[in-house]
Design a protein with these regions (language model features):
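Interdomain motor-coupling "hinge/lid" segment immediately C-terminal to the ATP-binding subdomain
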Residues: 2, 121-236
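Conserved catalytic/switch belt of AAA+ P-loop NTPases
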Residues: 92-116, 123-125
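N-terminal pre-Walker A segment at the start of P-loop NTPase domains
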Residues: 1-21
Length: 413
């Protein structure tokens, strides 16, 4: 569990913990990546007590040693944890050599605040030697000390007709989605801070540190005001198709520059692109990805908005889905579906050969017309599609049609 000390000093368990522990028993190396301040360092230090050596590359002395004598960091028989390894990606080659000399489960636990598989200049992926996990900002159930994400696994493994019973039996209780969107999921502002003013100071410090320090680790960016302007513009496009030409026009930057900046934001786990489900049978489909943010609190701060919108509710559901997906052993995809004619399903979960379509509506009273695109999706994909899930902000849990269940978002997330 992730021990986070704050107003309440009891442990805050994280959904990823069982998956991390299990993979350390199987693989020689486990790599935990995610945005800065999601709790990676705290999480892995819990596993270092009395049994692992811990080195962080935030320490300049450790960086100097990594450059001068990497074998000194990775050698020996004691398991090693290397924190913020993206600062010296050449260390991955030393880790590979150490594993090849003596392959042992749990030998290395690495963390990084950038996606090592997307970083330019990283030539070593530890293929066949490492398992990769992503720690996303905390879900609302993690913030409530329940140690998990939403009930996605319950819905995936149950028959459609069992969904009502599953949701009624396990609910974390109602919550104001707007308040959740404002505080986001980074542990410090989400759990330890109680006022909007405190969070605003934290988010501004986070943005400045990212621009002035963390971003420079990935790429030399001199025009920081331009980069921040692009970040702000992206925050206004939550849930929209990624159109780099339009973004470039909005921020008055060349399209290749916008392309580069978006890739850097994605590499840093600040921006999330959701791919399209593009298996077309009878309908022509859009194939561009949709854009979301890794944390709604940060997105609201960067945009200057104070009132969350329906797009922020979608983003909250996506964050919960990502937490669930990235701790699973079985491969799953989070996608969206949109036809050229304008029919759209916000998210499609593809796993085990089946499709779970999800629509998110910021309404307290879902109506039959809100289920129209879910039903269209089911007609298009037949037996491959599960019943549709219509998430809303009210309290009603009911089948609005024989194949679409309307459920409060807080019953699932």
């Amino acid at each position: 569990m992730d021990i986070i000390h704050g107003v309440n000093t009891l442990p805050l368990p994280r959904h990823m913990q069982p998956a991390l522990t299990q993979r350390l028993r199987v693989m020689p190396a486990v790599v935990v990546t995610g945005a800065r301040q999601t709790g990676k360092s705290t999480l892995v230090q819990v596993l270092t007590l009395g049994e692992r050596r811990f080195h962080t590359l935030d320490d300049l002395d450790v960086v100097e040693l990594a450059q001068r004598d990497p074998e000194a960091l990775v050698g020996g028989s004691t398991p090693v944890t290397l924190d913020e390894v993206q600062r010296e990606p050449d260390l991955l080659l030393a880790v590979k050599r150490a594993i090849d000399r003596r392959r042992r489960a749990g030998q290395f636990l690495l963390t990084g605040s950038a996606n090592l598989l997307l970083m330019r200049g990283v030539s070593e992926s530890l293929a066949g030697r490492a398992s990769y996990l992503t720690l996303w900002p905390m879900t609302r159930r993690e913030q409530r000390r329940l140690g998990r994400c939403g009930l996605w696994e319950d819905l995936i493994t149950a028959e459609d007709g069992e969904w009502l019973d599953r949701l009624r039996a396990d609910s974390a209780g109602p919550e104001d989605w707007r308040a959740l969107a404002r505080r986001g999921g980074f542990p410090t502002p989400a759990v330890h801070m109680t006022t909007a003013a405190e969070r605003a100071v934290w988010f501004e410090g986070y943005a400045r540190t990212y621009l002035e320090r963390d971003l420079q680790t990935l790429s030399s960016i001199a025009a920081l005001p331009d980069f921040r302007r692009l970040m702000r513009a992206a925050c206004f496009r939550l849930g929209q198709l990624v159109n780099q030409t339009e973004l470039a026009r909005d921020v008055a930057l060349p399209q290749p520059t916008v392309h580069r900046y978006i890739n850097l934001l994605e590499t840093s786990f600040l921006l999330v692109r959701v791919p399209a489900y593009a298996v077309n049978r009878t309908k022509r489909l859009m194939k561009s990805p949709k854009l979301y943010w890794g944390d709604t609190g940060l997105a609201l701060h960067l945009s200057g908005l104070t009132a969350p919108t329906g797009a922020h509710l979608e983003n909250l559901v996506l964050n919960d889905l990502l937490c669930w997906r990235d701790a699973r052993t079985e491969h799953s995809e989070i996608l969206y579906w949109r036809t050229v004619a304008g029919e759209e399903v916000d998210f499609v979960v593809e796993t085990g050969g089946r499709l779970l379509p999800i629509e998110v509506k910021a309404t307290t009273r879902p109506r039959l017309r809100d289920a129209a695109h879910l039903r269209s999706f089911r007609r298009e994909y037949g037996n491959a599609a599960r019943a549709g899930l219509l998430l809303h902000t009210g309290t009603a849990l009911e089948w609005v049609t024989p194949d679409v269940l309307a459920a409060p978002w807080w019953m699932v997330c």
